[in-house]
Design a protein with these regions (language model features):
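Blade-edge beta-strand/turn elements of extracellular beta-propeller
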Residues: 1-10, 40-63, 108-113, 135-142, ...
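Beta-rich, blade/repeat-based domains predominating
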Residues: 7-22, 63-77
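Extracellular glycan-recognition regions
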Residues: 98, 105-244
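Structural motif
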Residues: 34-42, 91-98
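Short consensus segments that form the blades of beta-propeller domains
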Residues: 30-33, 88-91, 221-222
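Repeat-solenoid scaffold signature
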Residues: 59-103
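A short, structured loop/turn motif at beta-sheet edges
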Residues: 21, 42-48, 75-77, 104-106
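Hydrophobic core segments of beta-strands in well-ordered, beta-rich domains
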Residues: 13-31, 78-86, 144
Length: 244
């Protein structure tokens, strides 16, 4: 053990190890996912002893909680930046790119407006001085005019190629009903849910859905199939669905 954070820096995890200007650095998140901060440890010897420093914390920024768990990166133009995530509960974990600068061989991350040596996360900043690669917008909508699913889609569990068919000729996606295991108690355990990450906290989703039950004699009761359903879902540990 080269550093024990139980007293002052609890929940040390996700560490990165660097060497710069003769110092060895261990950069780690501390304090837990929702309300933590970014800790920096440095020493001339990789086995310590280590000095400790807080390079970024939530501070007065009430919209970016727990800014930590990331990595220092530098550009070919000599700029320093820090990538980290923010936990936003049901919305997931979003990625931030924070400006950074070295002060007395400590990395101050974000904007240190009050001059205390600890940066606060920013929500807007001048982009890195790098060659332009054009505008990039992750795909959200899909007309299903390809024989493959777009990268914006993901399954709720390990998938099978027999669950779907991309009908590019007619711009349609066909999903097949899948018999679930007997011990499945709710949709959280169902693997064949086709999902996307939420694009933003407030959005509208529309889809044209045609439900064609598998009308076989073995599963037909009063002209309805037992157990089959389809529709749209807001999926998570809690979920809500509009379904047939």
């Amino acid at each position: 053990i080269v550093y024990d954070g139980h007293e002052d820096q609890p929940t040390i995890e996700g560490t990165k190890f660097y060497k710069r200007n003769g110092y060895y650095y261990i950069m780690s998140p501390a304090g837990g996912v929702k309300y933590g901060w970014q800790v920096e440890l440095r020493s001339k010897n990789p086995y310590g002893p280590y000095e400790e420093y807080v390079g970024m914390a939530q501070g007065k920024n009430k919209k970016v909680n727990g800014p930590h768990q990331g990595a220092w990166v530098d550009t070919q133009n000599g700029e320093d930046w820090f990538l980290h995530f923010q936990d936003k509960h049901a919305y997931g974990r979003v990625v931030h790119l924070q400006p950074a600068k070295w002060v007395n061989d400590w990395l101050v991350i974000g904007d240190d407006k009050d001059g205390d040596g600890c940066g606060d996360p920013v929500q807007q900043w001048k982009k890195p001085n790098l060659p332009s690669s054009g505008n990039f917008q992750p795909k959200e909508s899909d007309d299903f005019n390809s024989v493959d699913l777009g990268l914006q889609w993901q399954w709720n569990g390990p998938y099978s190629q027999y669950w779907y068919f991309c009908d590019a000729k007619n711009s349609k996606l066909r999903l097949y009903g899948v018999q679930q295991a007997e011990d499945v108690k709710n949709l959280y355990d169902v693997p064949n849910l086709l999902l996307q990450k939420l694009p933003t906290e407030n959005f509208t989703a529309t889809a044209k859905v045609k439900f064609i039950p598998n009308r076989t004699e073995a599963y037909k009761e009063n002209d309805k199939v037992l157990g089959e359903s389809a529709g749209m879902i807001m999926q998570g540990m809690d979920y809500a669905a509009l379904k047939f």
